[in-house]
Regions:
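Flexible glycine-/small-residue-rich
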Residues: 37-39, 92-96, 104-106, 136, ...
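Short beta-strands and strand-coil junctions in structured, solvent-facing domains, enriched
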Residues: 41-42, 78, 99, 109-110, ...
Length: 170
C-alpha cells in the first residue's frame, strides 16, 4: 500500500502543468463599471431633496454630512462638542437614526446590530460625495427595510482624469 501511495505522489509531482498562453506584456482595456442605486424621481410619491457637490461645500465648511443635512426640512441633528466633528445623531420627521437607511453607492452603512450609522467613523465624507438624496418619510422599496423613517442615498464622485486639490481656509 505504501508503494502505491508513493508511486501516486511521484506521478502527481512529475506531471508537467501548463499555464496556457500567458503574455505578461499584453494589456487589456476593460469597460467602465457604473455603480448606481435607485433614487426618487419627479413622479415618485416621496418627498426628497437632492444636494450636489457644490451645494454640500457651500453649506458645509467642516465636511460633516450630518451638519449639512441639518439645514434640510424636517431634519433635527445633535452634534457632540458643537464643532460638527465627532459623534452625531440625526432624526428625520421625528424618526430616530435606527430607522433611517443610509447607503453609499447602494451599499448600506447602517450597523448590523443597532441599525444606527456611526458618523464619527466616516469623517470628511462630504469631500468624497458627488450627490446626496434625502428621502423624508417612507422611502423607495429598493432601499430596504431600514427606510421606514427616511433614506439617505449618497453617490461618490467619479475618478478624475487630472489631479486636483481643494483647500478651504476659514
Amino acid at each position: 500500500m505504501r508503494g502505491f501511495l508513493f508511486f501516486g505522489a511521484l506521478c502527481a509531482v512529475s506531471v508537467p502543468t501548463f499555464a496556457g498562453d500567458v503574455n505578461p506584456d499584453k494589456i487589456e482595456k476593460l469597460d467602465s463599471v457604473i455603480v448606481s442605486a435607485s433614487r426618487a424621481g419627479e413622479n415618485t410619491p416621496v418627498t426628497f431633496t437632492n444636494l450636489n457637490k457644490e451645494e454640500l461645500r457651500k453649506v458645509n465648511p467642516m465636511n460633516s454630512l450630518v451638519q449639512a443635512l441639518s439645514l434640510q426640512p424636517s431634519v433635527v441633528t445633535s452634534l457632540e462638542g458643537g464643532t460638527g466633528l465627532g459623534y452625531s445623531k440625526m432624526t428625520v420627521r421625528g424618526v430616530k437614526g435606527s430607522q433611517i437607511n443610509v447607503t453609499l453607492n447602494g451599499i448600506t452603512l447602517n450597523d448590523a446590530e443597532s441599525q444606527e450609522v456611526f458618523w464619527v467613523n466616516i469623517p470628511a465624507l462630504t469631500s468624497l460625495i458627488n450627490s446626496v438624496q434625502l428621502q423624508r418619510g417612507l422611502g423607495t422599496s429598493s432601499n430596504g427595510p431600514g427606510a421606514f423613517g427616511a433614506s439617505i442615498n449618497m453617490s461618490t464622485a467619479s475618478v478624475g482624469t487630472s489631479p486636483f486639490g481643494y483647500v478651504n481656509v476659514a
